[in-house]
């Protein structure tokens, strides 16, 4: 088992690089994108095209209906099944490529996060939410002091999740968390660009998405699932939904999408820069593929030498 991750801010060229590397390695690509797991959300999520999926096998995309929820634990389980037992899933030989910008997905794999196996309980969450955040936080203080020290008093989502895990499993969430590092080699590659260059790439990509049918995609999704579908409030879709509602012009929707995407990229950069194991490359470098390929070959050569010892 060997894993190569390719991470970094959006629009840095992760998917293209992964496609080239996977083709050279004869490997598969696992998506680490929290929106590409959903069917029908294609253009706005920059999902690999049918042609790209035919060139290299992609997994963990289109595995959920837009109305479903995939927990982090479920994602981790599915990803690990490919990484640890690729022969049972495909005819492709490792290394496996894990590619995307959802930091928590990648962390769940490379850090081996221990995640409570408690699924969402909407009825319980609703009952707790009706009590108000202040009361819920007091309840959490009584049952899990360790979790309280890590959760801000105003963090409704994490407070409800901690209480949900406790009441469903009978054990504090803090006792069900931690890390269990994988026992296989991992090479972590990160792509980034100069801020202004990345801004231009984001603008170009957004305009391209609109050209190839993003507005039509959003319109169809609204008609099929209703405008209140949570996924339609995410980056790119929310802005185009505003345009379709007549609240803003198309130019304004594009401008807002670019701005929000740049803000998102900044948050992604902050997240990934917190992990010193990641080896960074300039996503705008003309010889990017050659540089990364050289590092990958070095990585695989060292592993081969260790295996022969």
UniProtKB/Swiss-Prot annotation:
Site-annotated residues for Interaction with substrate tRNA: 102
Source organism of this protein record: Trichodesmium erythraeum (strain IMS101)
Name by which UniProt lists this protein: tRNA dimethylallyltransferase
Quaternary structure note: Monomer.
Amino-acid positions noted as binding substrate in the UniProt annotation, renumbered to this chain: 10-15
Catalytic activity: adenosine(37) in tRNA + dimethylallyl diphosphate = N(6)-dimethylallyladenosine(37) in tRNA + diphosphate
Cofactor: Mg(2+)
EC number: 2.5.1.75
Keywords: ATP-binding, Magnesium, Nucleotide-binding, Transferase, tRNA processing
Gene Ontology biological process terms, A to Z: tRNA modification
